[in-house]
């Protein structure tokens, strides 16, 4: 029986103000534009461009994270990346 497979984030780069380019383990690359987001609660520090730019890949969780223990669930990131793919160069 084949289990459901969710690709994980293996690369991340800030390519604009609150815009991430994410690379997933299945080769999917997508640009995610968070510029219209107004983060609240524990995510509020992400409103600051300098804090947002400190994004790192959390290999243990398979997603992206920021200082202060902030991370985003990988499932919606993957769905957004598939909806906004970057063509291979």
Model-predicted regions and their roles:
Residues 1-89:
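Motif-centric detector for short Cys/His coordination patterns
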């Amino acid at each position: 029986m084949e289990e459901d497979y969710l690709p994980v984030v293996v690369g991340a780069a800030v390519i604009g103000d609150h815009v991430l380019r994410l690379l997933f383990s299945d080769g999917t690359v997508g640009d995610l534009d968070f510029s219209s987001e107004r983060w609240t609660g524990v995510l509020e520090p992400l409103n600051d461009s300098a804090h947002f730019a400190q994004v790192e890949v959390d290999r243990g969780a398979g997603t992206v994270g920021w200082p202060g223990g902030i991370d985003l669930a990988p499932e919606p990131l993957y769905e957004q990346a598939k909806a906004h793919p970057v063509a291979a160069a």
